[in-house]
From Swiss-Prot:
Pfam families: Ribosomal_S19. Belongs to the universal ribosomal protein uS19 family. This is Small ribosomal subunit protein uS19. SUPFAM superfamilies: Ribosomal protein S19 (SSF54570). The gene is rps19. It comes from Natronomonas pharaonis (strain ATCC 35678 / DSM 2160 / CIP 103997 / JCM 8858 / NBRC 14720 / NCIMB 2260 / Gabara) (Halobacterium pharaonis). InterPro entries: Ribosomal_uS19, Ribosomal_uS19_CS, Ribosomal_uS19_euk/arc, Ribosomal_uS19_SF. Disulfide bonds: none annotated.
Length: 140
């Protein structure tokens, strides 16, 4: 199976045979045809009001500099579109807003995939009384 995106022989990014500039000039329906099935279905069924607002914010922010002022959103289920490349989003992970800088390789994924909601637990050493056998261990 070939990958969805490639770096061409000139070092130019392509997504399913289209350069980034070509992708950014396409309409939303044309881009949807290139996306994976789940993301394509999301767009074909119609974006929600909140997702439409996020698209408008991204369109406005594309003309401005957003490095210092990321676009804040709770929409973890928003597919990453070519017009988002280069923008910075602050995606809510259930506790705080974390920065996600969109790169060309992220096209076709969801915003939430790049901001995890759970952290892995790193347990320390067991203490006194943690197990039945440790109740009678003498203290140092």
């Amino acid at each position: 199976m070939s990958s969805e995106y490639q770096i061409g022989h000139e070092g130019e990014f392509t997504y399913r045979g289209h350069t980034l500039d070509e992708l950014q000039e396409m309409e939303l329906d044309e881009v949807a045809e290139l996306l994976p099935a789940r993301q394509r279905r999301t767009i074909k069924r119609g974006l929600s009001v909140e997702q439409e607002k996020l698209l408008d914010e991204a369109r406005e922010a594309g003309e401005e500099e957003t490095a210092n002022n990321p676009i804040r959103t709770h929409l973890r289920d928003m597919p990453i579109l070519p017009r988002f490349v280069g923008l910075t989003f602050a995606v809510y992970n259930g506790q705080s807003f974390e920065r996600v800088e969109v790169e060309p390789e992220m096209i076709g994924h969801y915003l939430g995939e790049f901001q995890l909601t759970r952290t892995s637990v790193e347990h320390g050493q067991a203490g006194i009384g943690a197990t039945r056998s440790s109740k009678f261990v003498p203290l140092k």
